[in-house]
């Protein structure tokens, strides 16, 4: 998917990009490739692949969820900024917080935000388990996103504590998501969530499977969650 195809594909979904936004994506791609030579940000560096598997894939959530109704977003373990920064470029009103445990990624994200002229973006170098117990952030976000490889039960413990009551947790998964969801149902309920919607679709060009789950927070997460760093991964609630 080249930049022109990317622009057309988004327009077909009702997302019209301005010249400024197109340049932001171009600069994002260039910086990602440039910085990737000195630090491991992504295995995907071909332009068409980046536009499809990073940019388009990140924004695909907006085909099913109305981002205009959200104000604050927290992205847990965003790595090189996915999915939250492509979404932010498309919806500039959003106030985005990214938490990641790797300091070098923070350095990249700081430089990227400055280069792209992004405002209302904040980057936090922290473990998600510690961040989720921080009163300044706990149960403060309209939407929390995760596009991570961790199991859904683990992601729920890391992300649900950050979602405000009435807010949403948006999980982006590739294949075999239904099986993961079944295993995670106990955890989702324990942390105050209820699975509201599931959208299954294929990424264009390569036709790979994608799943988006919207989990609504119906009650507060018990204070003891998330547990200490490493525990959710070692002893997932399933």
UniProtKB/Swiss-Prot annotation:
EC nos: 2.1.1.-
Name of the top EC class for this enzyme: transferase
Coiled coil: none
InterPro entries noted in UniProt: rRNA_ssu_MeTfrase_G, SAM-dependent_MTases_sf
Cellular component terms (Gene Ontology): cytosol
Keyword NADP: no
Residue numbers binding S-adenosyl-L-methionine: 77, 82, 128-129, 147
Molecular-function annotations in GO: rRNA (guanine-N7-)-methyltransferase activity
Keyword tags: Cytoplasm, Methyltransferase, rRNA processing, S-adenosyl-L-methionine, Transferase
Keyword presence, Cell wall biogenesis/degradation: no
Role description: Specifically methylates the N7 position of guanine in position 535 of 16S rRNA.
Family indicated by similarity: Belongs to the methyltransferase superfamily. RNA methyltransferase RsmG family.
Name assigned to this protein: Ribosomal RNA small subunit methyltransferase G
Upper taxonomic lineage: Bacteria, Bacillati, Bacillota, Bacilli, Bacillales
């Amino acid at each position: 998917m080249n930049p022109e195809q990317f622009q057309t594909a988004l327009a077909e979904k009702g997302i019209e990009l301005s010249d400024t936004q197109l340049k932001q994506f171009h600069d994002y791609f260039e910086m990602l490739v440039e910085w990737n030579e000195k630090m491991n940000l992504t295995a995907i560096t071909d332009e068409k692949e980046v536009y499809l598997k990073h940019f388009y894939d990140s924004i695909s959530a907006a085909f099913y969820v109305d981002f205009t109704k959200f104000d604050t977003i927290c992205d847990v373990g965003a790595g090189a900024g996915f999915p939250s920064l492509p979404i932010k470029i498309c919806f500039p009103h959003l106030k985005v917080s990214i938490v990641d445990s790797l300091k070098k990624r923070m350095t990249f994200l700081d430089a990227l935000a400055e280069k792209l002229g992004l405002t209302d973006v904040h980057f936090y170098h922290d473990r998600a388990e510690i961040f989720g117990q921080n009163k300044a952030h706990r149960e403060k976000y309209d939407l929390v996103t995760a596009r991570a490889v961790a199991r859904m039960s683990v992601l729920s413990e890391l992300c649900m504590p950050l979602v405000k009551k009435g807010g949403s947790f948006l999980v982006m998964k590739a294949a075999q998501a239904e099986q993961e969801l079944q295993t995670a149902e106990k955890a989702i309920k324990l942390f105050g969530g209820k699975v509201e919607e599931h959208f299954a679709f294929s990424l264009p060009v390569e036709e790979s499977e994608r799943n988006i789950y919207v989990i609504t927070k119906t009650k507060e997460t018990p204070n003891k969650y998330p547990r200490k760093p490493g525990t959710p991964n070692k002893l997932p609630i399933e």
